[in-house]
Design a protein with these regions (language model features):
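Flexible metal-binding regulatory segments at protein termini and peripheral loops
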Residues: 1-129, 152, 250-251, 335-343, ...
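Transmembrane helix-loop-helix hairpins at the membrane interface
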Residues: 88-242, 353, 718-723, 729, ...
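Membrane-embedded alpha-helical bundles of multi-pass transporters
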Residues: 112-126, 155, 174, 413, ...
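ATP-driven catalytic headpiece of P-type ATPases
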Residues: 91, 310, 431-477, 507-588, ...
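Conserved cytosolic catalytic loops of P-type ATPases
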Residues: 26-43, 49, 201-202, 233-327, ...
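Conserved catalytic phosphorylation-site environment of P-type ATPases
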Residues: 291, 350, 385, 398-472, ...
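Conserved ATP-binding TGD loop and adjacent catalytic N/P-domain core of P-type ATPases
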Residues: 16, 29, 269, 433, ...
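Juxtamembrane coupling segments of multi-pass membrane pumps/enzymes
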Residues: 186, 192-195, 208-269, 300, ...
């Protein structure tokens, strides 16, 4: 996706106009414009020049975002997000208020409350009118941006909010100017009644008040919108500007864009790490909270990776740069959050469609309002006031901002907590999850075996057993051996040199230690060497049932003991699973382990269903089957999880996983904590709830406000709206929507106390029976739909799914249905059942 900066947009109608114009360019497959970040994301083969030209022809400016260096890009993007609008609006507001206060004094203070005026103006109605004209003209000149933008958009046949303001204020001014000339003519003709009549037709104060109140609203809106991008700006500010690079043995400070892959750089305590790298010398504790939200420092030593923008807290380290420029973790996070802001959530489509026709519709309603009141016999002043009220109370911005502000704030909250949503779609859809499929290794479990139990034989201490096991296992490359080595290192146990080491495939290890023959391996192998006491056998079997692997060790034909090794579950996994279940989500664990081991891990984690013996290439088909039962999220971290992550409705990658898994996912968890999965879903639900609130108030505001402004209720209740109050309401509407979205910043994504179960149309694995049928002849999705509908018409079939790629159909049964019945239903549609 190519990113562009866009200038000149003032409301949702503007962004809609740019989007439509660019989407028409040949070669553009998708276009999404963000009013909040003044940016545009475009996909397709169209040239940048054609895209920029299309935006310019629509009346707006566009430029391609630079790609020269992450530091320059971060600085440029940060500059684009900097709130330059609020200071300018503040100056305009102060100047406008100065003239407006004087105008209100002359137009209302003197006329309504008899406030004193200079003697030369006393009873001089023409002079009073002329002063009001000049004062209101001054306010209009100060706020000329509304007129320039509004009428320019009108000429491009794409009216926007500025057009409504310009028409409303302009109409008030033009009619008042006409009334002033008419009053002057009446005074010259000695028509005192005409003078008094026209004097009450002045709307100069309305013209100025509309502009001033809209400016107030714009300033509040700009300030609030600026806060919605705080998280993104905060990430950009983290980008280091310089690095201490060592070249030819000399340390020098260079701009960050000059750092190249393979450069050696030094980082002292208190300094930010400039680029991603690997430690080659020294050790330290690094604060990674800027990227992961985790405040506890992480120990780093030789061979450990470090990331840009994290803080070296204690020791001096030297590192080799592995990722620089746009490839650093920080740059990727910034890009991910920025790209998400440039995308649109499905729920925004309705508001976008309305925004696209809203302004022309309002102009038409205002014109009809004026004509109807004139036909009903009301004066031009009354009719015009109703039409102007319609123009200035209508607010397309509230509709246009309802979704993007909530998406932006939600993405910011996620980023601050180490949860990255790649698109607005993923932020919206994650909260609708009904089934969560968890890969076992590295997701539920730590991902590397650890020693869990040490059971020494009689007369042997734990240290003695571990010492012999350490000496034997240190020459093995097996993952289980590494667990024994890590435990011995942790306890400070020293290994002894062994001789005649041999690895016996499928059995175990053997070696000579100080003249003694030692063996290590599984129960079957060791049982062939010595007799194992029943007590030890029983304990070993119990460990195996818990999903642990018991390793037996003997020396000189004497059992020395058992060391149990297992890939232990993460501390937060059971709690995370409970939270998901409390949210009404069914939790399924996928693993390639045997059923006994899988069941043990599943029981510890508390999942609803365990699917064991799943080969790496089989995860994708399992996810496809689960999707037929409900909206499914897949959580994984490895390369073999990528197809399943892509197939799932929502793919969630654990941050410590591979780049391939992260690329395939819709949501990335920077920390390796499973508890971030319910947190992400919780945040998604909160964001969606906020969007619904915003859309409701934006729609209801216009539904109530426009008829009130048009005078629909005058006959029934006598209600009518002064244009000035309409302008005030318009000013506050967008501000209220943005402020409501900012409430998401206060949302605690870890608080599970308010979780609500949502009604799910899922099928519990233990309550239903599932059958897989091999089918020949399916060639396309239409074939799949035919087979699916045929099966679901059979009584007792709760759900069915079919895949022409896999050549199979899967049915979930709530009652006993014979294979013959299923076969006949499929073959009646012209397909062949082969198994």
């Amino acid at each position: 996706m190519e990113q562009y900066n866009v200038t000149g947009m003032s409301c949702a109608a503007c962004s809609s106009r740019v989007e439509k114009a660019v989407s028409k360019v040949e070669g553009v497959t998708s276009c999404s414009v963000s009013l909040l970040t003044n940016s545009m994301g475009v996909e397709g083969s169209a040239s940048p020049q054609d895209i920029i030209s299309a935006a310019e022809e629509a009346g707006y400016g566009a430029s391609l975002k630079g790609k020269d260096s992450s530091a320059k890009n971060a600085s440029a993007d940060e500059d684009m997000l900097t709130d330059k609008e609020t200071p300018l609006l503040k100056k305009r507001l102060i100047a406008s208020l100065g003239f407006l206060i004087v105008l209100m004094y002359f137009s209302m203070g003197h006329m309504m409350w008899g406030w004193p005026v200079p003697a030369v103006l006393e009873h001089n109605h023409v002079a009073m009118g002329l002063i009001q004209l000049l004062l209101s003209a001054a306010v209009m000149i100060i706020n000329q941006k509304f007129f320039i933008s509004g009428f320019k958009s009108l000429l491009h046949r794409a009216p926007n909010m500025d057009t409504l303001v310009a028409l409303g204020s302009g109409a008030s001014f033009v009619y008042s100017t006409y009334a002033l000339f008419a009053m002057t003519n009446a005074q010259m003709n000695g028509d005192s009644a005409g003078v008094m009549s026209y004097m009450h037709e002045f709307y100069f104060e309305s013209a100025a008040m509309i502009l001033t109140l809209i400016t107030v609203g714009k300033m509040l809106e700009a300030r609030s919108k600026g806060k919605t991008t705080d998280a993104l700006k905060g990430l950009m500010k983290l980008a280091p500007k310089t690095a201490n690079v060592i070249r030819n043995g000399i340390e020098e400070t260079v701009p960050i864009e000059q750092v190249r892959k393979g450069d050696i750089f030094a980082v002292r305590p208190g300094e930010n790490i400039p680029v991603d790298g690997v430690v080659i010398e020294g050790s330290s504790a690094v604060n990674e909270s800027a990227l992961t939200g985790e405040s506890i420092p992480v120990d780093k030593e030789k061979g450990y990776t470090v990331s840009a923008a994290t803080v070296n807290q204690s020791g001096f380290i030297k590192c080799e740069a592995t990722r620089v420029g746009e490839d650093t973790t920080l740059s990727q996070i910034i890009k991910m959050v920025s790209d998400a802001a440039a995308t649109k959530a499905p729920i925004a489509k309705v508001a976008d469609k309305v925004s696209g026709i809203f302004v022309p519709a309002v102009i038409l309603i205002a014109a009809v309002t004026i004509i109807v009141w004139l036909l009903l016999g009301e004066g031009i002043g009354f009719a015009l006031a109703r039409g102007i009220s319609v123009l200035v109370i209508s607010c397309p911005c509230a509709l246009g901002l309802a979704t993007p502000v909530a998406i932006m704030v939600g993405n910011g909250v996620g980023a601050k907590n180490g949860i990255l949503f790649k698109t607005a779609v993923s932020l919206e859809e994650a909260g609708k999850t009904q089934i969560v499929a968890l890969d076992k290794t590295g997701t539920i479990t730590v991902g590397e075996p650890k020693v869990t139990n040490i059971i020494p034989a009689d007369g042997v201490s734990e240290e003695e057993l571990l010492e012999e096991a350490y000496s034997l296992e240190r020459k093995s490359e097996h993952p289980l051996a590494k667990a024994v080595l890590a435990e011995a290192d942790k306890r400070g146990i020293k290994a002894h040199e062994v001789e005649n080491f041999a690895a016996l495939p499928g059995n175990g290890l053997s070696a000579d230690l100080n003249g003694r023959k030692i063996f290590g391996g599984n129960m079957k192998f060791i049982s062939s060497k010595v007799s194992i006491p029943d007590k030890i056998k029983t304990e070993a079997q119990k460990l195996a049932e818990e999903g642990k692997t018991p390793l037996f060790f003997i020396s000189d034909n004497m059992l020395r003991g058992v060391i149990a090794v297992a890939d232990v579950i993460k501390e937060d996994s059971p709690q995370a699973v409970r939270e998901l279940q409390n949210m009404g989500i069914r939790v399924v664990m996928l693993t390639g382990d045997n059923e006994k081991t899988a069941a043990a891990i599943g029981k510890q984690a508390g999942v609803d269903e365990v699917i064991a013996g799943v080969l790496p290439d089989g995860k994708e088909s399992v996810i496809r089957r689960l999707r037929s039962q409900g909206k499914t999220a897949m959580v994984g971290d490895g390369i073999n999880d990528a197809p399943a992550l892509t197939r799932a409705d929502i793919g969630i990658a654990i941050g410590a996983g591979t780049d391939v898994a992260i690329d395939a996912a819709d949501v990335v968890l920077m920390k390796s904590r499973l508890s971030d999965v319910p947190a992400a879903i919780r945040l998604s639900r909160a964001a969606l709830r906020n969007i619904h609130e915003n859309l409701f108030w934006a729609f209801i505001y216009n539904v109530i406000g426009i008829p009130l402004a048009a005078g629909v209720w005058i006959g029934l209740f006598g209600w009518k709206l002064n244009p000035m109050f309409g302008a005030a309401a318009m000013s506050l509407s967008s501000f209220c929507v943005v402020t409501n979205a900012l409430r998401l910043n206060l949302f605690d994504i870890r608080d599970s106390r308010r979780d609500k179960k949502i009604k799910q149309n899922t099928v519990k694995g233990g309550e239903m029976m599932e059958k897989t049928i091999k089918v020949e002849g399916m060639m396309c999705p239409h074939c799949e739909a035919s087979v699916k509908s045929a099966l679901e018409e059979i009584p007792g079939v709760e759900q069915a799914s079919a895949s022409h790629e896999a050549g199979e159909a899967v049915v979930t049964l709530s009652a006993d249905v014979s294979d013959e019945t299923l076969k006949n239903a499929i073959e009646a549609k012209g397909y062949k059942v082969v198994g």
